[in-house]
Amino acid sequence: MGCAPSIHISERLVAEDAPSPAAPPLSSGGPRLPQGQKTAALPRTRGAGLLESELRDGSGKKVAVADVQFGPMRFHQDQLQVLLVFTKEDNQCNGFCRACEKAGFKCTVTKEAQAVLACFLDKHHDIIIIDHRNPRQLDAEALCRSIRSSKLSENTVIVGVVRRVDREELSVMPFISAGFTRRYVENPNIMACYNELLQLEFGEVRSQLKLRACNSVFTALENSEDAIEITSEDRFIQYANPAFETTMGYQSGELIGKELGEVPINEKKADLLDTINSCIRIGKEWQGIYYAKKKNGDNIQQNVKIIPVIGQGGKIRHYVSIIRVCNGNNKAEKISECVQSDTHTDNQTGKHKDRRKGSLDVKAVASRATEVSSQRRHSSMARIHSMTIEAPITKVINIINAAQESSPMPVTEALDRVLEILRTTELYSPQFGAKDDDPHANDLVGGLMSDGLRRLSGNEYVLSTKNTQMVSSNIITPISLDDVPPRIARAMENEEYWDFDIFELEAATHNRPLIYLGLKMFARFGICEFLHCSESTLRSWLQIIEANYHSSNPYHNSTHSADVLHATAYFLSKERIKETLDPIDEVAALIAATIHDVDHPGRTNSFLCNAGSELAILYNDTAVLESHHAALAFQLTTGDDKCNIFKNMERNDYRTLRQGIIDMVLATEMTKHFEHVNKFVNSINKPLATLEENGETDKNQEVINTMLRTPENRTLIKRMLIKCADVSNPCRPLQYCIEWAARISEEYFSQTDEEKQQGLPVVMPVFDRNTCSIPKSQISFIDYFITDMFDAWDAFVDLPDLMQHLDNNFKYWKGLDEMKLRNLRPPPE
């Protein structure tokens, strides 16, 4: 159907960088069209396959416009078409005509209202500009409603030209209700019209173009065989495709707008729901098997994938759920996806599936696989069947093997490398290659992170045995905190601060600082109240624990234990830790810090294993000292009722506390150092950073607290806490850092001397007292073990003072090393 005879259309090309024919000056009087020209259609010149549009800026310079990008979708914007509806030619009409010419838009002008709809249905204009200044000559609002009545106008931008008025502005709601997109206050200036068109092109028109593209996306959703559901961040259902309705037995009208919680679910899966929510609330996808209830009450097993969608403000605005029913009626692909997904769910929930049900599932899958054996190789299906009964890592390897069969060669080779890594025993511990330029680092790694080489000569190293009982001291043990001598009380005045002087307390207590600092620290945290024990019982316990530290050790003595206890208490007082840990966690941390090196012989695990010591034999060369510290501490505690701080606890509380203490003491073993740090970074730091980027809202804070307070994450936090407390010497003020470096070096020197005397392997050759560079050893220790761990801990707890000390101390050791000095301090000037 053509346009009315009154509509005249002509087309011509605009020469590049050439002035428009008969272009009028940009005067306030407005432009005039050449005599007899009613319309102008000005197509942009475009070569075949051109991916950029061209328009001109105010100076006539060509401007490139990229294709429209809509998510992962890219499409080209055709030359825009503009329909001008003016009852007479005036300056405003001519201004828009010339602006269209300047912008390179096709322009059509019509004067008769009755011809507008027919013309629009023929051309499908992107922009319609209607003269709204003379209602008696042209009822613009009625015309707009008429256009909007056509479904084809859904994505059309309609602009109304209104008069400039001096009186008070009226509401534009009637204007919008009529169907107008926006209004334009009359201004015939060509540049004003041109700028308005550009704003429309890159604003409303571009947005409508994207909305129009959504039709193809919705078409795909509506015709998808997968059931798809979209909900808001508050879990209100916004969309459900026909496959979802068919699967669940609901109609769209029953679901749209309803809260997800109102839809019947299997209440027995509360733990699974918690797992799902904890995953998707931090922006991670979740996939697994989920049992839902249909409208008619039937249970249905689904392979569900839930994808959080980030929207405005970087926050999660929608959740997309893609659902497949695991009914085995169709293809082997669906079978494999269901089984693989079920595997993922097992890992997520951490629960064993019912053995009987599991075997039924295996038989069902095997039966279905027989029907489709021609579609998939038997080897793939055999691997997939085994997933339901194998260990998690085996399931992962099987899934990768199955994926390799249909992957191109580069992907297959990359997956081979992944499998090679997965088959190693230490997934979280980095592999260290020998560094020729850093023998100190090599020796530290070998000496602290291995159990040594077993000596086969038959010679055995026997630790000096002593009775595990209280050792007499030349100082008076206090009856209570109120009975502490004045000098010792003064030495403990600043125990709440990080720069607390532990060496002053050591001197005041004649090398027995643990009992005094322990009494004060435990009182501050209310440990006696939690354990339901008296202060005298706690005092006796601290006495027997301290008595079993070797005062002859330069480093691993009760002063080190008191220092670790102080650091632990300092960390526990930080706000993030107080919000995360429970009282029982605090008690476990303080007790673990107190006992973590009890009866330490002043030798490393590697030394004991190489020497064939009684402890190494007892603990099978695995975490020898750490196992001994924990076991002996509980033997000492429970062996005498007078010092048994656990005697009044409920059995379940005691078991939980004991487990927490042992876990923290074992975490101080350096062979697991990188495993603990990497797990903390991946499970705590990274998810926390993602959540905190979303802003500090009450809802977001609740998600953070829920994530941090899971038992698994609290365990990781406690391990990291005691690890950092145990090796915090490089983060102490410089004078204390130097003293600790002197003590640990002397202990290592003594071990090297004994290894040479007994003909044992020397596990740390650089710690030879005649040749060792203490600055180099400190630099290597900080580089390899301290920096990354404290960066992660600081990101979680916020410890600016410690990080400043660490930086200062590193610079100090670096300066000594650059001066080729091997001692603790520079020579006096």
Curated annotation (Swiss-Prot):
Domain PAS positions: 213-283
Modified residues (Phosphoserine): 20, 359, 386, 457
Recorded domain comment: Composed of a C-terminal catalytic domain containing two putative divalent metal sites and an N-terminal regulatory domain.
Source organism: Homo sapiens
Modified residues annotated as Phosphotyrosine in this record: 461
Protein name according to UniProt: High affinity cAMP-specific and IBMX-insensitive 3',5'-cyclic phosphodiesterase 8A
Required cofactor(s): a divalent metal cation
InterPro entries tied to this protein: HD/PDEase_dom, PAS, PAS-like_dom_sf, PAS_fold, PDEase, PDEase_catalytic_dom, PDEase_catalytic_dom_sf, PDEase_CS
Gene coding for it: PDE8A
Post-translational modifications: Phosphorylated at Ser-359 by PKA under elevated cAMP conditions, this enhances catalytic activity.
Key words of the record: cAMP, Hydrolase, Metal-binding, Phosphoprotein
Gene3D superfamilies the UniProt entry points to: 3'5'-cyclic nucleotide phosphodiesterase, catalytic domain, 3.40.50.2300, PAS domain
Expressed in which tissues: Expressed in most tissues except thymus and peripheral blood leukocytes. Highest levels in testis, ovary, small intestine and colon.
